[in-house]
């Protein structure tokens, strides 16, 4: 597990150990695992987690982002993981408070409307579902206070495309209206 070394401090060596023993990333699920501690920390920093926050992470995999979020101590922390291997991995871990609720589910089928109260959502989005998942989350989560998504370069180019360019489209207009 990526995140704790007994003092609940971030450990990149631990994620490398977990990945060495784990099955390879599944291309069919669009998996790509973060291995860089600085990148993981920067992504979590953008979420601006406070002790009163509720945080939901999509696709934690080995836990590069998960460990850092847990260290920040949100009031509530949930994981949605489609891959049963990684869902079981997180469910079996003993962690200090706050408790982490692990849902072995497909985020594309998740009832975003069911999230009560304010939520912050974060993900190193699976490549094959990044765009539709962003649409679902932003349009269906009733009280989304902040969302941070790491996406592949091509998706990022579409998100921030300028009018008249080949990448400009409905996703560009829609997302840019929120930022």
Task: Report the location of each language-model feature.
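Catalytic cores of RNA-modifying enzymes
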Residues: 1-179
């Amino acid at each position: 597990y990526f995140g704790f070394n007994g003092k609940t401090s971030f450990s990149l060596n631990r994620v490398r150990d977990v990945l060495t023993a784990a099955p390879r990333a599944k291309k069919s699920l669009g998996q790509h695992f973060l291995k860089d501690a600085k990148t993981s920390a920067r992504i979590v920093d953008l979420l601006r987690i406070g002790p009163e926050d509720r945080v939901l992470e999509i696709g934690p995999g080995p836990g590069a982002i998960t460990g850092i979020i847990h260290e920040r101590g949100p009031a509530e922390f949930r994981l949605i993981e489609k891959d049963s291997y990684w869902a079981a991995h997180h469910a079996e871990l003993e962690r200090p408070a706050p408790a982490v609720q692990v849902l072995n589910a497909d985020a594309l089928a998740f009832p975003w409307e069911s999230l009560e109260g304010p939520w912050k959502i974060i993900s190193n989005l699976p490549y094959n579902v990044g765009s539709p998942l962003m649409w679902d989350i932003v349009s269906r989560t009733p009280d989304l206070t902040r969302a941070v998504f790491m996406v592949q370069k091509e998706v990022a180019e579409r998100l921030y495309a300028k009018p008249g360019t080949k990448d400009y489209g409905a996703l560009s207009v829609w997302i840019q209206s929120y930022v």
